[in-house]
Each structure stands twice: as C-alpha cells, then as structure tokens.
Amino acid sequence: MGKNGVRLWENANGNDDSPVTETECFIPAKSMGHGTTTRKDLTTPDDVWTTMLLLTQDIGYNLRINKQKAAGVAVNIRDCKLMTKQWQCKLPIPTGSSINLAKAAFSLFKSSYGWENPLRSVTVTAINLVSAAMPTQLNIFDDNKKFEQTEKLEECAYEVRDRFCIDSIVPATLLRCEALTEKTSFLPGGW
C-alpha cells in the first residue's frame, strides 16, 4: 500500500505525530465540477449548450459560497459507445460566473469534438481555483466592461435566489431542456 499504508498503520497504532489541526482550519478546494448522464443522447450542439449551462449553475453557486474563482475549465464527455474524452483550457480572466464558465466550456467542446457519436454524459469542472478576493489583471484588448457586468448581474441573481427561492431566477434556456434527467429543481439542491 506504499506510504499511505505505512501512515495508516502508524495512525491505527497511535503513532500519529502530526500537529492537531484547528477547528477553523479551511482547506480550499482545487477544483469544482458537476456532471450528468442525460435521459437521451445529446445529438445537437444546442443540447450540449443547455446541459453545460445547467451544470455551470451549480458550479457558479459553489464557487460563490466558497469565495473562489476559476482560472480554467475542463470538459469531460462520454459518447453513446462509452468512449470518454477530456479537454481543458485556461481562462483569460478568473471568473465565478456560471455563464462565463458555460461559454468557455462550450467553446472548448465545439473546437475539440467532431460529433463522431451522440453524447451520453457531460461533466464540466472549474479548475485552477483562486480566491475571489485576489486582484485580477485585465487585458486592454478585451471587453472588460461586459465581463464585469456579467459578474455583477450574476451576483444580483444569486442574492435574489438566496433571499427568495433557488428557482426564482433561472436562465430561460433551461426551461425547455428535454434531454436532461428529471429534476425537482434546476439549480443546486435539486440534484
């Protein structure tokens, strides 16, 4: 069992000499992801976009709760022949926005997948997480105003969801999604 086996044996025999961890000790997550197997195979890019948008709603919510942003995104797909493929990329600006994560994931998917087979499952993962309080270096050539507006808009939407109901604000695209499994809610808590 290697070094973990040795550590397990030492702990089981009371030979643990590591310092006691404080109760408020918080170990930040290194990645956050969410995936789903759909009720029927995804055959169009629109189906994949809707699925990714749904998945990133959960990821964005968890990033907000943990006060983190993603500096990268990873996409894992499994087709109807159960072949798995995975891609990842860095984001130009770290984000906690579910729509920005969905756009990056979908762009990565579109540029990498050739639609050899319909898709059975999709997983989106926010990677290279950083603190939300960390300053961000902006690029003068990008549309930073639109990026900031999207971040602020989603922050307001999350505040409304926290105050009233998790389903009080839902992207309209998710209201017509047929390919996904039955859920009691579109957002976290209904999984």
Question: What do the predicted segments below correspond to?
Answer:
Residues 91-191:
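Acidic, metal-coordinating catalytic segment for phosphate/diphosphate chemistry
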